[in-house]
A protein has these predicted regions:
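Alpha-helical scaffold segments in carbohydrate-active enzymes
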Residues: 28-42, 76, 83-86, 99-117, ...
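Aromatic (Trp/Tyr) and acidic
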Residues: 64-67, 74, 133-165, 192, ...
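Extended glycan-interaction surfaces of carbohydrate-active proteins
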Residues: 38-69, 109-197, 235-239, 243, ...
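Aromatic-rich carbohydrate-recognition surfaces in CAZymes
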Residues: 1-47, 70-78, 195-209, 223-230, ...
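Structural helix-adjacent loops and short alpha-helical linkers that scaffold large soluble proteins
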Residues: 12-30, 85-106, 146-161, 210-230, ...
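Non-catalytic C-terminal accessory modules of carbohydrate-active enzymes
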Residues: 191, 208-318
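Aromatic-lined, polymer-binding surfaces characteristic
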Residues: 1-9, 49-63, 70-91, 132-133
Length: 318
């Protein structure tokens, strides 16, 4: 399955400061990256992945056995390369830092030049010889890793978050644009990613959105947009009146599509805590010892908030 393990390990280090653990993982993380290079890299330098191995079966853009260049795997590999480069710096390995820094730069250019659909103004899956020509939530994953340039060219993609023909639905953000003729056409109950809401995807998009709002000089999104999507994300996670998270839910009714099946309730694929801490409350982990806090909370929503017992870089902040 696709993953962003190196990025996640570095992100953990930016919170707990445990350098010994980070360096202990260095060899394994590099070995994993090299394996992906051997098995999933295309001739043009991009990476392919099937829908199933991305954890996103039955999508509009791909298929269970299709080897397409998707925004997911290519963003993950970029994030992992950036992380490995940083780990190289932290370990005093200049060769490693340079090697993976160059890989990250190459992938950044490939994603921006090959996966950006200029007609749709969106990052999309590239099939064998053409774009899949469908906007899907995975098109926001490049911002999960701060991949796109800080130019106005790419920020227009975020307007789709607020468009009811795009990804905006009564119960949250859909996994495919609602205007597409194949939206929700693949049935129900077999892991469809053709439009229904998946907390996994919502969590990725909300993380990417927080990065976009914190790290880019953008004018598209406001705190109220992020706050509203967080409200929907939280409100959707109930079943029969109790807190619950399952596989995926109907975008209009909020019904968990496999809610009463045993398998569904084992899905803990939501980075709920991280979204609250680093997004909504806005404690932004860093490599240095600066404490950066930028809440994405509209001025008229809360009089106050308290995030208590926050362990950061070996200190209890509150």
């Amino acid at each position: 399955f696709s993953s962003w393990n190196a990025d996640a390990v570095l992100a953990r280090y930016m919170v707990d400061g445990d350098k010994d653990y980070l360096l202990d993982m260095k060899k394994d993380l590099e070995t994993e990256y090299q394996r992906w290079e051997r098995t999933n890299r295309l001739k043009n330098g991009l990476y392919w992945q099937g829908d199933v191995q991305d954890g996103m079966e039955e999508s509009i853009s791909g298929g269970r056995r299709k080897k397409y260049a998707r925004p997911t795997i290519n963003s993950y590999m970029y994030g992992n390369a950036k992380a490995l480069s940083c780990i190289g710096i932290l370990s005093g390995d200049e060769g490693m830092a340079m090697k993976y820094g160059m890989r990250a730069d190459t992938l950044k250019n490939l994603v921006e030049n090959e996966l950006w659909n200029t007609r749709h103004q969106f990052f999309e899956t590239m099939r064998t010889d053409s774009s899949a020509n469908v906007r899907e939530a995975i098109g926001y994953i490049p911002w999960y890793f701060n991949l796109p340039d800080t130019t106005q060219k790419y920020e227009i993609a975020w307007k789709e978050i607020m468009d009811e023909k795009g990804f905006s639905a009564p119960y949250g953000l859909t996994t495919a644009e609602r205007r597409h003729p194949e939206f929700r056409t693949r049935g129900v109950g077999k892991c469809e990613w053709d439009g229904a809401i998946w907390p996994f995807a919502s969590a990725q998009t909300l993380t990417a959105m927080a990065n976009f709002m914190n790290n880019y000089p953008q004018t598209v999104l406001s705190d109220s947009v992020y706050f509203r999507q967080m409200e929907l994300y939280v409100e959707s996670q109930y079943h029969r009146g109790r807190p619950y998270i399952g596989e995926y839910l109907d975008e209009v009714t909020g019904y968990w599509l496999k809610g009463d099946q045993e398998r569904s309730r084992y899905y803990n694929h939501s980075t709920f805590n991280d979204l609250i801490i680093t997004g909504l409350i806005g404690l932004r982990p860093r490599l240095d010892n600066t404490i950066e806090v930028n809440p994405l909370i509209p001025a008229d929503k809360w009089d106050w908030f308290c995030l208590d017992n926050v362990l950061y870089h070996g200190h209890n902040l509150t």
